[in-house]
Amino acid sequence: MLFRSNYAPSDWCYNSLFADDNTLSRKGDVRLKATFTSQDANRVIKYPNGTYQLAETSDYTCTPVVISRISEMYLIKAEALGKTNGAAALVEYMKKRYTTAPSEAAIKALSDKEYQTLILDERRREFYAEGMRWQDIKRTNRLELLETLDGRTYLMYYPIPQDEIDMAGTVAYPQNPGYAGYTGN
């Protein structure tokens, strides 16, 4: 399934995903050339056919973007099967992405947390600017991977759109903490 809109990541998202030493050192990672540039900080809008355009503004939208593709299926499978059984699926995926991939034995030698971090790092690179990082961190309860919440724990939740609260009718449907007065506009 593929639904696409013209969107750009927020400044915070873009700055946290710009090419770093880890990304630059990955030999054969074709996504580096396709997604990042070391010359400037233009935002990238990706399209299903592999083309892209630079965003005209850093404004971002709340329009949902749902993408499902084979690379995501490999990573979901590797994560679901766990380190013992998922190593082969992860190696298969990585061989399609890199000229060199870690061996199955090397992946199995990782601790469970290191294995999960490896998959989360792959998902971060694979789904750059697609809005999946936050859900991955929340789903795996790995908030330490965020730079900082600066004590703003309400950022762990999304605001509930006012339309949804209104549709609840007589049922009390409180807004999530930290979003008092949020209307969704």
Q: Language model features by range: what are they?
A:
Residues 1-4, 8, 19-185:
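Acidic/polar-rich alpha-helix caps and helix-coil junctions
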